[in-house]
Amino acid sequence: MTASRLLETINSPADLRRLDRKQLPQLASELRAFLIDSVSKTGGHLSSNLGTVELTIALHAVFNTPEDRLVWDVGHQCYAHKVLTGRREGMSTLRMHGGVSGFPKRAESPYDTFGVGHSSTSISAALGMALAAKHKGEDRKAIAIIGDGAMSAGMAFEAMNNAGVADADMLVILNDNEMSISPPVGALNNILTRLTSSKTYNVAREAGRHMLGFAPPLLELARRAEEHVKGMIAPGTLFEEFGFHYYGPIDGHDLDALIPTLENLKKLKGPKFLHVITKKGQGYKLAENDPILYHGVGKFAACDGIQSAKGPAKLTYTQVFGDWLCDMAKADSRLVGITPAMREGSGMVRFSAEHADRYFDVGIAEQHAVTFAAGLACEGLKPVVAIYSTFLQRGYDQLVHDVALQNLPVIFAVDRGGLVGADGPTHHGTFDLSFVTCIPNMTVMAPADEAECRKMLSTAMTIDGPSMVRYPRGSGTGTIPEAKLDTLPVGKGDIRRRGKDIALLAFGSLVAAAVAAGEELDATVANMRFIKPLDADLIVELAGNHSLLVSIEENAVIGGAGSEIERVLAERGLQVPVLRLGLPDRFIDHGEQGQLLAELGLDKEGIVRAVRARTNPQ
């Protein structure tokens, strides 16, 4: 068999397990080259996937997947797993509409045992699977693979606390690729881990504990001595305190260390914790040198790497926010910025450099981020929490209980509102208008273009209470914001076009499509701007001289802005029909943003079609 054809023979982990162990390094080399070539053509998460090639091979070589459950945290590192579990050919459709998902997805493969996209869920899920197996009398393993960044979230520690008490038969693998909690790794650590994970060592360890149990002082002395020695060679004391047996750290790119260690741990019972050191971008120098740039990439030439865009490009909403944040910080010393580990994605790189003392990255900890902001607001500061819509869900109780209930002036700059594209249902921001608008004291805004986004952010600074500015991924109409920090009148919309008979009431990202549809329908078009407080006067005015009102929003139609329009009409006894256009009551799959909007009838043509179907039923 030629070296170049080794990967082509792997259509399932069973094929992998039939290989000679000496062939696995070659398989890793081929798999890494395949991922670089494949992702360069489709885009996707690259550096994190290159860092887990050997770990993925070792896991599928040792464990009987899918009978044994592998649970990947976040999912950014699942591409090698997908290739080895029968989806190699499908990788050419990665993150495309109707193609392979960029994250583990239960409906896609039995090897994807738990759907994921957000962080820090793996230990909880694997614990549930482990205890279910115990309850059903089934002999199978549950393994959670979690990154060091995801370990900063409280949910991970809640799960570990529970797992230690439950004495669950599970394995947690810490994929540590940032060296944030690790000493240097070398041969000594690998040898020690193989030794301490062996059956012989652990049988002797338990026998010794049993014997010393008859002499409690000696048992306590032995326990302290063991912890002291471990503390000298490995940072595992914290995990031992949770009731886990800690092993590592070991080199996550050394198959000769990984496989024997995993084989040993497979034989041991109870909660186990393996600390593995990997390198983001491993094997591709460009990604090794800049793992953040190559974390999530578009299409690129593998030989040249990511190239800077040529020519002027439209400002993205994220850039508009980042520029505003720096400008407002110069104008108002009360402003501070907070991000839950999304500095680059949320547009805070420049702010973090220019105002380092006013910039707070709290890690992957959305709950903490929101309440931390509340504490800052209590002391007279103006905290701005930059967060993706989908991640705001994780801090909902804190938004209600710690911010809104106390009417604290925290600004939420909510990026990725609406459909985000290739990342799919775990990352679409489809619910925020519904779940934030219902909270008392909140002011909720959605800009129609980049210039309006800047004005809304400035408006939020003037509001003595919590507010949210919600904007989409990418660029808008190309409107260039002025350098001024102008504001808007709170709760007032704007008529973009005067027509007759039909009024289109559009919110945020869909105003441009509504204006285009209004031209064809000769309809009035209103840019509503504020979801809360709604411009009730404008709604009543439009209801008085139009026979049909059409609400248009890139949010779940249930409980969204359209429902609020109907509430206003009902409270005033106005019986004008309302056609609500928005996202349907289902999770939207991945695909290009424009393609998804067209499919859901939220582009110009879809709006025209829906209105004509309502006014001229066949």
Swiss-Prot record:
Pathway linked to the protein:
Metabolic intermediate biosynthesis; 1-deoxy-D-xylulose 5-phosphate biosynthesis; 1-deoxy-D-xylulose 5-phosphate from D-glyceraldehyde 3-phosphate and pyruvate: step 1/1
Enumerate the UniProt keywords alphabetically.
Answer: Isoprene biosynthesis, Magnesium, Metal-binding, Thiamine biosynthesis, Thiamine pyrophosphate, Transferase
Report which residue ranges the record marks as coiled coil. none
Note the PROSITE patterns from the entry: TRANSKETOLASE_1
Recorded hits in InterPro entries, A to Z, give: Dxylulose-5-P_synthase, THDP-binding, Transketo_C/PFOR_II, Transketolase-like_Pyr-bd, Transketolase_C, Transketolase_CS
**Could you confirm whether the keyword Secreted appears in this record?**
no
List this protein's GO terms for biological process. 1-deoxy-D-xylulose 5-phosphate biosynthetic process; isopentenyl diphosphate biosynthetic process, methylerythritol 4-phosphate pathway; terpenoid biosynthetic process; thiamine biosynthetic process
Record's catalysed reaction(s): D-glyceraldehyde 3-phosphate + pyruvate + H(+) = 1-deoxy-D-xylulose 5-phosphate + CO2
Instruction: State the Gene Ontology terms under molecular function.
Output: 1-deoxy-D-xylulose-5-phosphate synthase activity; magnesium ion binding; thiamine pyrophosphate binding
Q: Which domain of life is it from?
A: Bacteria
Q: Which annotated residues bind thiamine diphosphate?
A: H76, G117, H118, S119, G149, A150, N177, Y284, E366
Task: Tell whether GTP-binding is among the UniProt keywords.
Answer: no
Q: Which principal EC class is assigned to this enzyme?
A: transferase
Q: Which SMART domains match?
A: Transket_pyr
Per the UniProt entry, the Enzyme Commission number(s) are 2.2.1.7
Question: Which PANTHER family does its entry note?
Answer: 1-D-DEOXYXYLULOSE 5-PHOSPHATE SYNTHASE-RELATED (PTHR43322), 1-DEOXY-D-XYLULOSE-5-PHOSPHATE SYNTHASE, CHLOROPLASTIC (PTHR43322:SF5)
Recorded hits in NCBIfam families, A to Z, give: dxs (TIGR00204), PRK05444.2-2 (NF003933)
Q: What is the role of this chain?
A: Catalyzes the acyloin condensation reaction between C atoms 2 and 3 of pyruvate and glyceraldehyde 3-phosphate to yield 1-deoxy-D-xylulose-5-phosphate (DXP).
Q: What is this protein called?
A: 1-deoxy-D-xylulose-5-phosphate synthase
Q: Which organism is it from?
A: Dechloromonas aromatica (strain RCB)
Its taxonomic placement starts with: Bacteria, Pseudomonadati, Pseudomonadota, Betaproteobacteria, Rhodocyclales
